[in-house]
Amino acid sequence: MARGGPQIIPRPAGWRAGAPNPWHGRLTGEQLSISHIESRLADLKTGRIPALAGPLMRPPVLVTKGQAAVLAALFKGSQGETRVVLTRRSTRLSTHSGEVAFPGGRVDPEEELHVAALREAHEEIGLAPEHVRIIGQLEPLATRVSRAAITPFVGFVDELPPLTPSPREVDRIFDVSLRELIEPDCYREEIWPIPDEVGGEFSVYVFEVEGDTVWGATGRMLHRLLSLLL
């Protein structure tokens, strides 16, 4: 299967190529292991790794619609490699239709963020909460479409059960190895101008995996997770 998928990236006039791949040749197999990922997420939580400063998203987004949470479910593949579960959202959805995303959604009133991420993963891909051990979280971000503060949680699944997509929300469930994500022909950075901000620019992170293109908020989350491992 060829790299890239049906997703359309709405590049603005004036965009340009960004920095080269920051991970290829630098991240080892050990650094891509579950144990190293868990250790680095713990360092982020305790402040040994500085949290990202500045706005939740570039360009800045005014958060007006509460909170959301997503789950990056990691598991070991048949060769011992670390893999992550992704979904292609249904083309029938009103927002981010057809885009690649982690399972997740809005947080209900009085609901804890990680509980919402687990609940949504169960609803969208049939991954029951008892199969997941939360090992950390990334900084929240937001999108101009959702206008919700999205908190990404990282979980480890010891034995991945059969997954079933919710017909209403998910068109495809797939997984990809972290090793593939750092390959030069998979990843690229693009620099986009910020509308109505003279000289303003922001980075867009794109991953061309087999059959799909990951970008936007999910691309930014994957970029952050991989960058933590250096």
Language-model features and meaning:
Residues 1-101, 105-123, 127-161, 179, ...:
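N-terminal leader/linker segments that precede catalytic domains of diphosphate-processing enzymes
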Residues 165-208:
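NUDIX/MutT-family hydrolases
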